[in-house]
């Protein structure tokens, strides 16, 4: 949580902006304690999580005109269940390779405020 900023809360998940200005990168964190894998959620929450991933993915595509979305559930370093949704373009700094190969670049205060405002506005539109 230190390297991310709260955007909004959905029914199941908290949505946070990862503090890496190289990529539009958000993280969905289901508000369920001690969940590590999607299979740890009950079936109702599994379905809700998939719906939230699809909802957020569509908004990310629209807001950032992506070439490709990377949707990843890794959790090797932070075991708490969380999903990364990263908007990629063919012009980004690590295309077509993984975002993990380039060093992150923190948002400036001004660009962070703009990014959070853009995401909040986009994610609140269709709810």
PLM region descriptions:
Residues 1-127:
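HIT superfamily nucleotide-processing domains
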